Amino acid sequence: HILWVDNPLNLTIFSGERIRIQGDNGSGKSTLLKLICGTLHPSSGELYRSEPLNILYLDQEYSCIDNDLTVYGQLEACTSRKPEHELKILLNRFLFTPPTWDKKCGSLSGGEKMKLALCRLLVCDNAPDLIIADEPTNNIDISSMDILAATLKSYEGTLLVVSHDEHFIRDVGIERAIKLLNAQAE
């Protein structure tokens, strides 16, 4: 499936922008996100991005989470500067109780993985320049949604979100929408 052939996609994203990507199924939303992340390369045309760019991609599988690590180990692996007690306080704030700290991440639900990815965001030594969130409100409960919205709202970097949840879009302060219609940007 080739996208944007008749009308090449021309898109500029500035540092600190908060953007929503919209479009019907098959319009190229996931393809665009993968191009921006660098996990997919364009078959034609050119893609320019600031380098180096530290990106946190919150896909629907939460692939940023290492399923072999424990919940606590996940945070410990991404920071050398935060003391143990600060990591545990953060886990509690994100509704991870002490019995869950030794749980393998592979056994977590989607909502739990999302919350853990957000914890990583707050403790990692290298904060991301860009967060890309692909349908982040799917399959999460209301308390997890509140945590997600508050965390993304307080994030000061560039934010790209694919979501059909209008309330969530307002809550995180989206400033601009890019609509992909018939495989082209509007």
Sequence positions of predicted segments:
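ABC ATP-binding cassette signature C-motif
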Residues: H1-E186
